[in-house]
Amino acid sequence: MRKLARICIICVLALVVLALIPALINGNFQSEPDTTIPPEIDQNALIADASAYFERMCKGDFSTFHEALPSGIKSQTTPEDIKSAWGEEAHKMGVSPSLDTATVTLYRPEFSNQLRVEFSIPGEKGDFCFFINYTLEGSLYNYVVWVH
């Protein structure tokens, strides 16, 4: 029993250290992570940009979004890959993605140098979530189909 307790304590300490690594690397020792959106970012324009991509994908056009991705991301995926991941997750959640039913949120994730526009649509089996990430300067960075 004591050995199990020690292992649990070591695991918890390891998780704490892993959580602190980004702060140590960035020299950010604040107790709270920086989640502020830079004031020079036009939040409405960023949401409109992401929403236009999302709406096109809802209508089946994944090529336009793929072409806009940075070359490093674009070379790792295809429009068909994005469409496939999108379709699988939408089917699994029992939802037909639509901008009209999406809750759209712009935020800066903790310990991140990115801005995220999140599209969340409630489904029969959970929420379908699609993230479009931008750099802190407002350039398209990447995307994530949230897999449950």
Where are these regions (language model features)?
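N-terminal Sec-pathway targeting helices
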Residues: 1-14
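Short, low-complexity N-terminal intrinsically disordered segments enriched in polar/charged residues
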Residues: 5, 23-58
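Secreted/luminal cysteine- and crosslink-motif detector
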Residues: 9-12, 59, 130-131
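Hydrophobic alpha-helical membrane-insertion segments, chiefly the h-region
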Residues: 14-26
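Prokaryotic Sec-type signal peptides and long signal-anchor helices
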Residues: 33, 58, 66-69, 132
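Second-shell loop/turn segments in exported
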Residues: 36-40, 51-55, 68-75, 118-120
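Short solvent-exposed beta->alpha transition segments
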Residues: 48, 63-112, 123
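Exposed beta-sheet edge and beta->alpha loop/turn motif
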Residues: 101-148
